[in-house]
Amino acid sequence: MAAEAAATSRFAAACGALSQYVRAADNVHRARTAAAAAAVRPLPLMPGADVAGDEREEEGGGAAASSAAAQMTIFYGGRVLVLDECPADRAAALLRLAASSRGVPRDDLASTAAAAGESADLPVARKASLQRFMEKRKGRLAARGQPYRRHDAAAAARGDHLALAL
């Protein structure tokens, strides 16, 4: 009994020492990774981009003038329209006008109707094409014969094989 208690206490002492060693090693590892993480710094994706912005800021008074009349780009009906020197109040008025209008221009209605007419003919053309394909497929299948026919079926029909009937 005394030997078991001594073995248990030695085992507990060994486990305690091992635990302290693992904790110390973990702390050292964490300190190294923290130092390595602090040394990492992101690289700029566009190195010249920040320089161009600094030069514009140094020019000074140009920034106030450019905000009053800036360039406006409009995408409408598949077209791109670029307006130079568009004042902010006119841009806001144009946006309000675009938001309030709900109608579709007559040109778009005509092109939509023409596109619908072309797509109506498409299913008929597909159907005819499918019919031609199926007819050709039938011909190919008939030429090949049955897919699982045995080559020696003719010999079996003649009776050249041995019958094991008792």
From Swiss-Prot:
This is Protein TIFY 11e. Induction: By jasmonate, wounding, and cold, drought and salt stresses. Down-regulated by abscisic acid (ABA). Its main location: nucleus. A motif (Nuclear localization signal) lies at residues 125-132. Belongs to the TIFY/JAZ family. One of its GO terms (cellular component) is nucleus. It holds the Pfam family tify. It comes from the Eukaryota. Keywords: Jasmonic acid signaling pathway, Nucleus, Transcription, Transcription regulation, Ubl conjugation. It is found in: Nucleus. A motif (Jas) lies at residues 123-148. Ubiquitinated. Targeted for degradation by the SCF(COI1) E3 ubiquitin ligase-proteasome pathway during jasmonate signaling. InterPro entries: CCT_CS, TIFY/JAZ, Tify_dom. Residues 65-100 form the Tify domain. The jas domain (123-148) is required for interaction with COI1. Signal peptide: none annotated. It comes from Oryza sativa subsp. japonica. GO terms for biological process: regulation of defense response; regulation of jasmonic acid mediated signaling pathway; response to wounding.
